[in-house]
Amino acid sequence: MRHIITGGSGFTGQILIRKLLQNGNEVVNFDIKKYTDCTLEKQSQFVYGDIRSVQDIRKLNLQPDDIVYHLAARQFADNVPRSNRQAWFFEVNVTGTQNILQAMSAAGTTRMVFFSTDMTYGMVNSCPVSEDHPQNPLGPYGSSKVEAEKLIRSYEKLNATIFRPRLITGAGRLGILGKLFRLISLNLPVPMIGNGTNRYQMVSVDDCVTAALQACKNNFPRENFNLGSLNPPTTRELLEAIIKHANSKSFLIPVPARLIKPVLSGLDKIGMTLLYPEQYAIADQNTLLDITKVNQLLGWSPSCSDITAMCAAYDNYINIKKTQ
């Protein structure tokens, strides 16, 4: 039995692979990028391939007893084009998903873990958000994940567990956080959309990996599960905690959402993107997921707080800067 990870060279993928190897499993990473952790190359099999290519996927030679963790995706951390964003996200997140599903079906491979996103919900009606909340994504990334979920559920013989995590953070995560950490490391003011009293929940990468392993342990229930931290702080509390941890002289500057959001929209349209619409639209909103279901059915509960995970991400950012 092999544990196959698509997109295993990414942030979550490498930590998942490391944990699977520690548990004595045979691991295969299917990705177009090499590992950043060189130690993983010696312990696992690497198959170079593009999820958009049916021929590349054939290199995996899928078997009925394989387990597929489908992490390959385009995200906002990548170089998102200024135009045709829907096609750009869909060719990997939707077409790529269809390709791996067809290969699994042909091989009789029936077990999958898929990481979707809470961005499938869009602007929410109430908090905390349960898994049966309507899916009304605000943009192309969330829409691509909704379509990927639909494809997965169309395969009736597939035992696929779908996770919808909040923003995944922890040591090694940058993306949008890199801009924040840079300001703090330089003791510069940190702008904040709104007054910071909203709770912007996150989830640690280690807790996400634990959830994937719990799905495996529980025979891959055909369910959708939210993933998020417990008792998230307010945005102001979170940012102040990181600034304090960094011994930075940075301070927060609240900016009225009604003023800054049109500015961010205009900057995005002319190619000077600071935040993408799907990001800034909810930055001043309460974003809390109900994790009751995953706790009850998988026995999963987060072990890492948002502040701890974000401080670990900041420390990692500083360590990387020191080596450059």
Region spans (language model):
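Substrate-positioning beta->alpha
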Residues: 99, 173-179, 193-216, 222-223
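Amphipathic terminal alpha-helices
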Residues: 293-296, 301-324
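NAD(P)H-binding glycine-rich loop region in Rossmannoid oxidoreductase-like domains
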Residues: 51-92
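Active-site Tyr-X1-5-Lys
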Residues: 136-161
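Conserved Rossmann-fold NAD(P)-dependent oxidoreductase catalytic core, especially the SDR/UDP-sugar
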Residues: 95-140
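Glycine/proline-rich active-site loop of Rossmann-fold NAD(P)-dependent oxidoreductases
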Residues: 146, 169-179, 215-225, 231, ...
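N-terminal Rossmann NAD(P)H-binding glycine-rich loop of SDR-like oxidoreductase domains
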Residues: 3-23
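Terminal hydrophobic/aromatic helix or amphipathic segment near a protein terminus
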Residues: 243-285
